[in-house]
Amino acid sequence: MSLKPLLLLPGLGLVCLLSACAGPLPKADPQQAWIDLAPESPNDLLADSVDGKRLNDGRYFQVSPGQHRLRMALLQGANGNSAQPDCLGRLDYAGFQAGGHYRLVESSQGQDVSAALLDAQGRQVAQSRPFSCL
């Protein structure tokens, strides 16, 4: 008997948690800044923590105006073969505005992985440090 199918269970559970099982996104609070994570990548970029506080929902960040440290996890390939993040990254930004909408976009150049923070007009306002990858 092969154990290979059993190795897929944690990954499948994570995919279920992050997809339809997670429910609809909450409505954005106009007193907070909302940060989407770009879904069009072949990798899954997930929200991990804000200012060191872990998040319950990895699909978005919502922060008060001002300076914050966002921590992200990246599952490369998003093929369900791993429930552990392949890379961890962080982005510091001091200009979050109430009611502002931002988007985090993962970018890879060879082995280097990072994320750019874009404002509502699509302009880059911050860049993460290079991610730490396994």
Named regions from a protein language model:
Residues 1-22:
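Sec-dependent bacterial lipoprotein signal peptides
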Residues 21-134:
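Short loop/turn and low-complexity linker motifs enriched in small/turn-promoting residues
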